[in-house]
């Protein structure tokens, strides 16, 4: 039994089948990229895996239990960062991290922002930051979270090359420690092919 399992998922949108019979099992330490053309359903699949949406058929299981039966405990193990940064624009970058990680002290939050490339921007209201900087505020959570499972939708959007490298290193560290990373990205990942598992939505099934 894997940590996270998708079993015979079917998803339809506007009378169009995005994917059907989609099954796969993920284990601790896996780093997975969901691939497919625009409109293939990558974001939709991520939302199914977070439990924010339900499939038209099939089910998603966490440690052998359907998500809807373990929703609360599952969400405690999950970090989800979608297309929108999901941050409070009236708060500063530092205040945002305190809001999401109340058990993190100031030093930890400052270090996370520095790791995300935001040293010197800690006390600036988020609504005064660029799109890329706002994205970095959300992604700074990767250096604070204790979640086992990270689901990230296009995390590298509006991030420069150095930022992408730093984030990639953090994801590698997380999987090496037994965590799971699932992401979509249009950017090539600068990691060994042996470290990445790809699940394609251009096919009806994934192993």
Curated annotation (Swiss-Prot):
EC number per UniProt: 7.6.2.5
Annotated residues for binding of ATP: 36-43
One of the Pfam families matching this protein, by short name: ABC_tran
Catalytic activity: heme b(in) + ATP + H2O = heme b(out) + ADP + phosphate + H(+)
Coiled-coil segments on the chain, per record: none
Top-level class of the enzyme under EC nomenclature: translocase
Bilayer topology annotation: Peripheral membrane protein
UniProt superkingdom: Bacteria
Molecular function as annotated in GO: ABC-type heme transporter activity; ATP binding; ATP hydrolysis activity
Keywords assigned: ATP-binding, Cell inner membrane, Cell membrane, Cytochrome c-type biogenesis, Membrane, Nucleotide-binding, Translocase, Transport
UniProt entry tagged with the keyword Lipid biosynthesis: no
The keyword Transmembrane is assigned to this record: no
Subcellular location: Cell inner membrane
Domain ABC transporter: 4-207
GO cellular component, one term: plasma membrane
An individual GO BP term: cytochrome complex assembly
Family: Belongs to the ABC transporter superfamily. CcmA exporter (TC 3.A.1.107) family.
Subunit record text: The complex is composed of two ATP-binding proteins (CcmA) and two transmembrane proteins (CcmB).
Task of the protein: Part of the ABC transporter complex CcmAB involved in the biogenesis of c-type cytochromes; once thought to export heme, this seems not to be the case, but its exact role is uncertain. Responsible for energy coupling to the transport system.
The name this protein goes by in its record: Cytochrome c biogenesis ATP-binding export protein CcmA
Gene: ccmA
């Amino acid at each position: 039994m894997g940590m996270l399992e998708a079993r015979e998922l079917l998803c339809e949108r506007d009378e169009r089948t995005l994917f059907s019979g989609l099954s796969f099992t993920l284990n601790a330490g896996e780093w997975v990229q969901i691939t497919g053309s625009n409109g293939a359903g990558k974001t939709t699949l991520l939302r199914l895996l977070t439990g924010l949406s339900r499939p038209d058929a099939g089910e998603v299981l966490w440690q052998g239990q359907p998500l809807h039966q373990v929703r609360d405990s599952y969400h405690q193990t999950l970090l989800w960062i979608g297309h929108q940064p999901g941050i409070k624009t009236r708060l500063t970058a530092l205040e945002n991290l305190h809001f999401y990680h109340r058990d993190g002290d100031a030093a930890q939050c400052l270090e996370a922002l520095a790791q995300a490339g935001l040293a010197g921007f800690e006390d600036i209201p988020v609504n005064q930051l660029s799109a890329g900087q706002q994205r970095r505020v959300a992604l700074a959570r990767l250096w604070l979270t204790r979640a086992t499972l990270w689901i990230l939708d296009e995390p590298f959007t509006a991030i420069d090359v150095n930022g992408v490298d730093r984030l990639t290193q953090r994801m590698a560290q997380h999987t090496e420690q037994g965590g799971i990373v699932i992401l979509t990205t249009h950017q090539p990942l600068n990691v060994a092919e042996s470290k990445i598992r790809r699940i394609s939505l251009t096919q009806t099934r994934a192993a």
